[in-house]
Structures are given as C-alpha cells and as structure tokens.
Design a protein with these regions (language model features):
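Walker B catalytic acidic pair
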Residues: 176-179
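Extended helical coiled-coil dimerization/tether regions that scaffold
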Residues: 3-154, 160-172
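Active-site catalytic pocket residues across diverse enzymes, especially alpha/beta-hydrolases
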Residues: 163, 194, 198
Length: 200
C-alpha cells in the first residue's frame, strides 16, 4: 500500500491489539443487517452516539506522504482534529487510487488503512517498515469507553470483523484458542460467528 500501490497481504495476523480498528471497521459496515444486529447487541443503536479519539505522532505524517491511508486519515481528521464522530468517519469516502482497491468494501479498506497506520514500532535493524502514526485509539459511546469491554467481547469483535468484513470465500482462518478466557455466555456467539463464515 506504500507509494500509491494497493496491496492486500496474503497473510494477515490479527491479535487482540487490533480490536479497536476491528470495531471501527464494523461501524463502517453498520448498514449491513448482520453487522447492525451485532452492533445493537453491543449497545450501539446509533453510530452518531460514538466518538473515536486518535492519539497520533504528528512528526510521522511525512512518512506516509503519498499513501491512500494517510490521505483518507487526513480527510477524517481535518485541521488536526483527533476526536471524530463515528458517523463522520463511516461516511467519509476512502477514495482509493487503484482499480483493485476500488472493488473492496469501505469497511475493509478502513480496516486496512488503520492497520497500516497503527502497526507496532519498527525494531532496530528492520528495513522497509514505516513507524506507526496512530499510537492509540479510544472509542466511546455517550462518554462510556469501549476499553472496559470484557476479553470475550473484544474477541467477538475480532471474529465478527474477520468473518463479516475481512474474509471471503477464498479465505482460510487459523484461530488459536478463540474461546480462551471467554465467558460461557459468549462462547455460543463466537461459535455462531465462526460457523456462519463462508470461507474455510
């Protein structure tokens, strides 16, 4: 995705650090009935009630100068605004430059953009990796932080995003104990999300 080129990784590693961007991707797919039902179960009935706050490193913006992800992020956060209404974020066009990216759903592109902009720090001696721009994300519903969600709820957000937004018929999912540390009431929801996935 760097240097104007669209790139979808053949292998995508998603762990618990991705749950915020997974929730944002689901919010961007709020008009999909199954996703809307899931958001309602989280207490989200109107995405306009959600505020998303980004903590960013301004000095690193230049590293992403000619990138679709940064151009979209700059439109979402005009004039350095870092507190954004979720409806604004969900309705801001992604405007991808490549024809291949234009075929992707907005929610998938938003996940990929935020994934790229918020990846872990580059380690010493690792070439060709860009330092992250977004240090942290806080999502609030009427001033109540989603950071207080249980581990099981965060895992369910990840599974829902993987199965409803990121995956397709050609995807193979490898899950490492997805129900570990999950309340018994959430295990059924996890199983249903996995079983309804159309990939493998």
């Amino acid at each position: 995705a760097i240097g104007e080129n669209y790139y979808t990784p053949k292998l995508l590693y998603i762990d618990k650090s991705c749950w915020e961007i997974a929730l944002i991707a689901l919010i961007c797919a709020y008009d999909t009935p199954t996703v809307n039902t899931f958001l309602n179960n989280l207490g989200i009935t109107d995405i306009s009630d959600i505020t998303i706050s980004f903590q960013i490193d301004e000095e690193r913006r230049e590293m992403f100068k000619k990138h679709d992800a940064l151009r979209w992020f700059n439109r979402v956060t005009p004039d350095g605004t870092i507190n954004i209404n979720a409806k604004t974020l969900a309705t801001t066009d992604t405007n991808p430059t490549s024809a291949l990216a234009q075929k992707e759903s907005k929610s998938k592109l938003v996940f990929q953009y935020l994934y790229l902009l918020s990846q872990p720090e580059r380690k010493e001696g690792e070439p060709n990796r860009v330092q992250k721009l977004i240090n942290s994300i806080d999502i609030k519903l009427k001033n109540v932080s989603f950071g207080d969600l249980s581990e099981g709820e965060k895992k369910l957000i990840l599974i829902e995003c993987i199965t409803k937004v990121l995956g397709n018929n050609d995807s193979i999912l490898l899950l490492d104990e997805p129900d570990a540390h999950t309340h018994i009431a959430r295990k059924k929801d996890l199983l249903e999300a996995i079983e309804t996935f159309e990939g493998q």
